[in-house]
Amino acid sequence: MRLKALVLSLVLCSIQMGLMAQQTVKIYNTEADAQKEVAAAVSKAANEGKHVFIEVGGNWCPWCLKFNKLITEDAKLDSLIKANYEVVRVNFSKENDNHAFLATLGYPQRFGYPVFLVLDEKGRVLHTQDSWYLEQDKGYNREKVEHMFLMWSAFTMKEAATKFGGSK
């Protein structure tokens, strides 16, 4: 009888810990001032020769969490992003929909969540990426994600401007 009670307790404890782990993944700050965070990222990006990468989504969004897991756990992607971008996660939820701020970016939420934006060192939107094009099966296509980060980096944009005779 005691063994059954012990086993039942362990099973219930495991289930509870699993549920708690799922609830603690919070990559989006629902209280953040998106406009201030992006302005700070633009300033830092300008000083460091980078672009700004904005992830719009929420802690409620499984595809947002999957994307974050990919780019933070894949060492090559993590290094690529840190070397070329200032990253800002802009929350969209019932607690804080950031509607006014997202309007200044051209309503990127029209693509669903997550949606990604690349801003230049002056805060201008260079690219809005619908995440659907990066998805594969139940996750993301790593090569497509890497390609997006490579093609929209400040370095690549400067190289393109030099090669094709224009300026960014």
Walk through the language-model features, giving the residues of each.
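A short beta-strand-turn-helix
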Residues: 30-51
